[in-house]
């Protein structure tokens, strides 16, 4: 479970990085002045990205519960369909917050969506791949390669 907190911290660091990129004008937004930029960040980007992070954490938590319940089951490979189904929840959330904020993020929609997708990859895919228990840790897409990469960096798996 400590590994999922590590992926959450990495995701929050990247979130803060995107926040700084927008604030400092490195990624230009069609907002004039510091006041308009601060208003856009506090009204649109920050709440929507926190919603995506929260929903992704909830989906990860549900997956951990499912994998824990089937940790020694011989047919745990059947539970991978739940993993895919739970992945759709954060992706649907990304679509929803993007549609709701489309008028606010006209020229930066690609950058905002990119930051959302990074959160889902870090928290959900990598987090569940390295933190699932029992036999479930071997059935997720790319989990063996991710676990090998993470352990080669020196993080114990």
Give each language-model segment a name.
Residues 7-18, 101-157:
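Alpha-helical membrane-associated segments of multi-pass integral membrane proteins
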Residues 55-73, 122-136:
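Transmembrane alpha-helical segments in integral membrane proteins
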Residues 44-66, 88-93:
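Generic alpha-helical transmembrane segments
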Residues 36, 40-45, 74-78, 104-112:
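Membrane-helix interfacial "entry" motifs
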Residues 3-10, 47, 51, 81-85, ...:
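Alpha-helical transmembrane segments of integral membrane proteins
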Residues 1-57:
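N-terminal signal-anchor transmembrane alpha-helix
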Residues 78-110:
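Hydrophobic alpha-helical transmembrane segments of integral membrane proteins
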Residues 65-91, 143-157:
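Cytoplasmic juxtamembrane regions at transmembrane-helix boundaries
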């Amino acid at each position: 479970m400590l590994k999922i907190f590590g992926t959450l911290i990495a995701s929050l660091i990247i979130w803060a990085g995107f926040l700084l990129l927008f604030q400092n004008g490195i990624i230009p937004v069609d907002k004039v002045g510091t006041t308009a930029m601060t208003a856009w960040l506090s009204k649109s980007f920050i709440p929507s990205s926190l919603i995506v992070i929260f929903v992704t954490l909830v989906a990860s938590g549900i997956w951990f519960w499912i994998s824990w319940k089937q940790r020694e089951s011989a047919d745990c490979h059947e539970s991978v369909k739940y993993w895919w189904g739970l992945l759709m929840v954060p992706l649907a959330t990304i679509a929803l917050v993007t549609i709701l904020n489309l008028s606010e993020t006209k020229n930066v929609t690609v950058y905002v969506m990119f930051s959302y997708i990074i959160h889902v990859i870090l928290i959900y895919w990598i987090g569940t791949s390295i933190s699932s228990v029992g036999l479930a840790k071997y059935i997720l897409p790319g989990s063996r390669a991710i676990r090998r990469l993470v352990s080669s960096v020196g993080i114990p798996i």
